[in-house]
Amino acid sequence: MTPGSAGAAAVALGNEDADLERRFGGLRRLYGDRGYAQVRAAHVVVVGLGGVGSWTAEALARSGVDALTLVDLDQVAESNVNRQVQALGSTLGMAKTDALAARIADIHPGCEVAAVEEFVDESNWPGLLARRADVVIDACDDVRAKAVLAAWARAGGTPLVSVGAAGGKRAAERVEVADLADVTHDPMLAALRQRLRKQHGAPRSGPLGVCCVFSREPVAMPAGDACDVDGSLNCHGYGSSVAVTATFGMVAAAQAIELVAFPGAKGGHRGRL
């Protein structure tokens, strides 16, 4: 490299750094130099890119996280438009991972996105990961997959944020954070707790070390001749509101940011919004 080209490269790098600072410097002012650097350097995994996980991934990209792994096997459908950030007329039929990766590239061009078109199960986890995760966000709607993620995270000490069911909820302000042991009014997380205790040796009393995002709001049952309710986070049967699903996703992202910015803290913030 000639002195001239080296100088040009240095200028380009300086311009890129300045651009990133303009985009994401607000986080530095909030979390301080060290916390900001931790967030920027983090590798965060989001499992499930529906009405919750898609907003989580977007929030992480807009917070300057430099490495994301996005895991989901589904394609964008018209029924996703009311609650999923990557669901647009122009993205119908695309893999959710690809549609969201393209969106993230426009938000944070320097973000390294690994798009993994798979559903998590005991046969492929953690093999789906190409590198160590600093935090995993479980926004999937399958209890077996949630148990695989939670058991692995508890065994290896990887910070995990597990999200409960958002379908049938209307009160976004009632979303809260608690240890899995203290979660109520969420059958999916209750089933996860039972699986961890019965199949993975989790204690019957005391904290379980799994940070959960959930709501104690009673579920509003589908009106009229709606399809059968399946209790899942992806809202097939229950009605769904983006105001609620996105709030779940944003709270999960906030927990992940706290965990990577302040790794000594246990479980991020607790309590209601």
Q: What do the PLM-derived regions correspond to, one by one?
A:
Residues 1-45, 78:
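N-terminal charged helix/coil linker that caps or initiates catalytic domains
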Residues 2-18, 131-135, 140-148, 160, ...:
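Glycine-rich phosphate/adenylate-binding loop
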Residues 46-48, 71:
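Conserved N-terminal Rossmann-fold NAD(P)-binding element of oxidoreductases
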Residues 52:
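Hydrophobic/small residue at the entry helix of a nucleotide-binding pocket
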Residues 61-67:
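Conserved S-adenosyl-L-methionine
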Residues 67-108:
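Glycine-rich phosphate-binding loop and adjoining beta1-alpha1-beta2 segment
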Residues 116-125:
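Conserved SAM/SAH-binding loop
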